[in-house]
Amino acid sequence: QAALFGWLPVMLWILIGGVFFGAVQDFASMYASVKNPDGTNLFPQNYDAAKWKTAADAAYKIIDGNLYQLYHSDDDDPYDNYYGITQEKWNSELIWTTGSKGRFIMSAHTCPTSVAGSSSWGFVGVTQQQVDAYPMAKTGRFPITGYESDGSPIVDQESGYPMDEMAYTDFVYPAWGGAASYKLNTVKMCTERDPRFYVTVFFSGSKWHHGNEMTLTSFAHGANGYTSDARPKSGFLVNRFYDHTANSANGQWGEITFPTFRLGEIYLNFIEAVLECKIRGVNIPANYYTKAMEVWQELRAR
């Protein structure tokens, strides 16, 4: 506990210097008039680029302390490396959690109605924009760079993303979370994506893994809650926070130590702050940029 609370001021400086406060000029009209009860402004009234260095310093202090390590699964599998962050309780990456809690609420809301049991509600989904944000596995490039006025995607031609994204194709769904790989026929949009996509996003036509069972699920043509509220409007559910090793059909939901702050986030905060300093001409220690690129490679390799 002493080690944990010793780092709390550092986390606050990251927030103060980072996007939410350091870049408050982007939301000036929204926040400028927000005040404390004593009349003092709650948010900065003027932009200060030097706060990016404050954020970089705070993040570097955590990184340099070597108290935490990025989580890796026993076999260093890229899918389980990501899934394990929320699956393995009290793992080496967690800095501050909400403690060990039951997963029922978050899991019941994301478990599709195709799964047996009275608590498979399946209506908390992922937006299409979030789906589009995941890079391609082979190139590492982000496929969708924006949208036309009619909502159609602007595709990075070098990403490897299929132009016929809604055409169906055979695909081998990857093995992760204790479940074996399997073949399915799905839209090309959902194929050959970054491992984080499959751990996070559940899409129609794939199988929901729960305990020793794999349940085929579709959100189209009246299947699995299409005519009720118990379905995701976007056609995608959230995979990640459900314990796929537990049998929720029998009321087993598992527990989670929810990662309020984890080392991966600190790495990203540090990288962002260092790059903002570089762009805005803010002086930082000579080793910061090298360290930022080093931890970026660690994240990508993981």
Language model: regions and residue ranges:
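Hydrophobic core segments within long, regular secondary-structure runs in both alpha-
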Residues: Q1, F21, A49-I63, Y289, ...
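N-terminal low-complexity segments that are often proline-rich with Ser/Thr-Pro
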Residues: A2-L12, I16
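Well-ordered alpha-helical scaffold segments within catalytic/enzyme domains
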Residues: A3, G22-M30, N269-I279
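Surface-exposed helix-capping loop/turn segments at secondary-structure junctions
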Residues: G6, N66-D74, L275-V282
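TPR repeat positional signature
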Residues: W13-V24, T260, Y267, V274
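An aromatic- and glycine-enriched ligand-binding surface/loop that stacks and positions planar moieties
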Residues: V24-H221
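C-terminal substrate/ligand-recognition segments
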Residues: G177-L299
